């Protein structure tokens, strides 16, 4: 009995002790929370706001606030300041709100956000700035928002989006830039760094050209509606291999070029409603293997041969939604019919025509090459390579690609590329093929037996009459070859020229080198001729200067030229002697002005000498006796005779 009482008491104590321990633990937890709250300061809700959920949600909407109110609790996780008159966000305004996750500043009059305005918001997940007056993107204010996932900037008068505008928030997953009606410029690097972005809204931004979206490698949803895209070209969505939803509604699109959607391999939903589309290129949606939702309604579709492939594709891949893709607008007898109801029996269609067929090409190794194949824009183009590979615009090859116009492009040809290449053009009525031979020679060797002829082989395939009543299906193209129902082959010999062996392959490179060599020769010749003319002119100038200097020197030398003086004795007082002297005069002296010389008694008295310059004639310094009459002459008579070399002075 005693043992039973002890067991009962033991169980009773255990039953009482457990609730006591539990209540004690709860009291301690409550005390700790109170102490923590006391240490953090008093948690009071601003008088102009309403708070709930223990101050974690603060709502201050429609209070006419011109600035962020003071005293917002530090444990706030949700702050709504929408529909006020806040004009500026100053730095460190929210510095104490470390737990804030959602900040709503939409529908204010914010014109400026200072750098550091969002400092301290390490936990911020969503930032709403839509319907404000921002003219620039406040990139500097996004610093340190390491957990930001959503950014709303819709309906602001932003004029441009510069490069790296959002690179400070690489964690961003949703970006709303819709209704930027003042937007005029988007930089090529505007979206650099947003490799985590999943959703982008650029609707109603007055965009006329598709911006560069290549950095958005992870983008899954793209809204481009309400813009002005007359055309959608290939490469517009380059790099968006992860895109799943694309909306281009009400954007005035009138033309979508073939291969425009080739890069969108993951696309699931495509909306092209409310545009100006009348037809689509053949097999436009073939690369979109996962496309299950397509909207083409409210477009002026022209139901002719170019629309047959689309009608078949809609019946084949979207059988449950016949009203998704609109009705025929033309011709009149087809107006109002759904696209899925259009069949081939209503039309007489022909196979596509190759307007510019490829031509045989001889080329050296390691060079670029192209084989053209220009076709109607509503047809599809594929190329069959010599090894059996079929390439389209969407195919990937390290060196060979199909351009948008159907041209087969080689970034670098190799010897193994030699062979026949076939361009295969397809529309709903049939196929047309054109082949060309590519001959690749070694860069170091000349190609022997080269011929300049070009052979173009064109094969046209049309649907047989038996196939008209059957449902249209695309003709499969395999590497083993193409099997047409009706085939006509036409070989056109453009030109034939027999050329001897050992003729080098004419190439653009050789022609360029010859042209360059000729230019160098002409340039050198011009330089030589110019130098010759310059030297000739210089020599002529030097000759003229030399002649003038020599003439001036001769004129100056006449002053210092030597003089010859002849002194002749004359006796005018003896007439008899004059007649005798005339008889004895030499026969060489005659004519007007001749002087009759007196008889010379002494031959030694005839003197000829050259006096020094400035000599005086007052006396004779020779010491010889002269005729007595010489001394009776009062003044000497000077006769000067000028010659080229000297001046002779004669004293009479």
UniProtKB/Swiss-Prot annotation:
Residues 1-40 form the signal peptide. Disulfide bonds join 45-51, 49-60, 303-328, 305-349, 373-423. Residues 41-74 form the LRRNT domain. One of its GO terms (cellular component) is postsynaptic membrane. Residues 1-526 are extracellular. Residues 352-441 form the Ig-like C2-type domain. Residues 548-652 are cytoplasmic. Mainly expressed in the brain. Expression is concentrated in the olfactory bulb, cortex, hippocampus and cerebellum in adult brain. Detected both embryonically and postnatally with stronger expression in postnatal stages. Glycans are attached at residues 321, 362. Interacts (via LRR repeats) with NTNG2. Interacts with DLG4. Found in a complex with NMDA receptors. PANTHER family: ANTIGEN BSP, PUTATIVE-RELATED (PTHR24369), LEUCINE-RICH REPEAT-CONTAINING PROTEIN 4 (PTHR24369:SF9). This is Leucine-rich repeat-containing protein 4. It comes from Rattus norvegicus (Rat).
């Amino acid at each position: 009995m005693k043992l039973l009482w002890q067991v009962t008491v033991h169980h009773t104590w255990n039953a009482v002790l457990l609730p006591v321990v539990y209540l004690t633990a709860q009291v301690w937890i409550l005390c700790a929370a109170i102490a923590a709250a006391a240490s953090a300061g008093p948690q009071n809700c601003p008088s102009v706001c309403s708070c709930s959920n223990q101050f974690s949600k603060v709502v201050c909407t429609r209070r006419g606030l011109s600035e962020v109110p003071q005293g917002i609790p530090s444990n706030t996780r949700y702050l709504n300041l929408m529909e006020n008159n806040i004009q500026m966000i100053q730095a460190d305004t929210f510095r104490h709100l470390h737990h804030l996750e959602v900040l709503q500043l939409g529908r204010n009059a914010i014109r400026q956000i200072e750098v550091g305005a969002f400092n301290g918001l390490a936990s911020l997940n969503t930032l709403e700035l839509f319907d404000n007056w921002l003219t620039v993107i406040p990139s500097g204010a996004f610093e340190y928002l390491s957990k930001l996932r959503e950014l709303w900037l819709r309906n602001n008068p932003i004029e441009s989006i510069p490069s790296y505008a959002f690179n400070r928030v690489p964690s961003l997953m949703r970006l709303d830039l819709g209704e930027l009606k003042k937007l005029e410029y988007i930089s090529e690097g505007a979206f650099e760094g947003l490799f985590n972005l999943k959703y982008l809204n650029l609707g109603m931004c007055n965009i006329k050209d598709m911006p560069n979206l290549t950095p958005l490698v992870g983008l899954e949803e793209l809204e481009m509606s309400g813009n002005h895209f007359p055309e959608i070209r290939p490469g517009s969505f380059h790099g968006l291999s992860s895109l799943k939803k694309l909306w281009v509604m009400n954007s005035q699109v009138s033309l979508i070029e073939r291969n425009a959607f080739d890069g969108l391999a993951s696309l699931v939903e495509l909306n092209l409603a409310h545009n100006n589309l009348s037809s689509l290129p053949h097999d436009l949606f073939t690369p979109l293997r996962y496309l299950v939702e397509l909207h083409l309604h409210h477009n002026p579709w022209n139901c002719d041969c170019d629309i047959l492939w689309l009608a078949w594709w809609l019946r084949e891949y979207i059988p449950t939604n016949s009203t998704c893709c609109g009705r025929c607008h033309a011709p009149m007898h087809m107006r109002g019919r759904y696209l899925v109801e259009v069949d081939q029996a209503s039309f007489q269609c022909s196979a596509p025509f190759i307007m510019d067929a490829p031509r045989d090409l001889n080329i050296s190794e390691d060079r670029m090459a192209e084989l053209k194949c220009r076709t109607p824009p509503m047809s599809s183009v594929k190329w069959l390579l010599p090894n059996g590979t079929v390439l389209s615009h969407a195919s990937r090859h390290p060196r060979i690609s199909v351009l948008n116009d159907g041209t087969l492009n080689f970034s670098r040809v190799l010897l193994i590329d030699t062979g026949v290449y076939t361009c295969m053009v397809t529309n709903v009525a049939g196929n047309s093929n054109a082949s060309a031979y590519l001959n690749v020679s070694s860069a170091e060797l000349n190609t022997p037996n080269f011929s300049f002829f070009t052979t173009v082989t064109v094969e046209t395939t049309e649907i047989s009459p038996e196939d008209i009543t059957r449902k249209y299906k695309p003709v499969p193209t395999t590497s083993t070859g193409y099997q047409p129902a009706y085939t006509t082959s036409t070989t056109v010999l453009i030109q034939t020229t027999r050329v001897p062996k050992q003729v080098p392959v004419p190439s653009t490179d050789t022609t360029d080198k010859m042209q360059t060599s000729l230019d160098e020769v002409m340039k050198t010749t011009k330089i030589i001729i110019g130098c010759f003319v310059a030297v000739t002119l210089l020599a002529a100038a030097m000759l003229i200067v030399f002649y003038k200097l020599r003439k001036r020197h001769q004129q100056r030398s006449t002053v210092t030229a030597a003089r010859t003086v002849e002194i002749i004795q004359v006796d005018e007082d003896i007439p008899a002697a004059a007649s005798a002297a005339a008889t004895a005069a030499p026969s060489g002296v005659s004519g007007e002005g001749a002087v009759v010389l007196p008889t010379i008694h002494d031959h030694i008295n005839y003197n000829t000498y050259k006096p020094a310059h400035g000599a005086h004639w007052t006396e004779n310094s020779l010491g010889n006796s002269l005729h007595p009459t010489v001394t009776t002459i009062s003044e000497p008579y000077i006769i000067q005779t000028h010659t080229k070399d000297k001046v002779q002075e004669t004293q009479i």
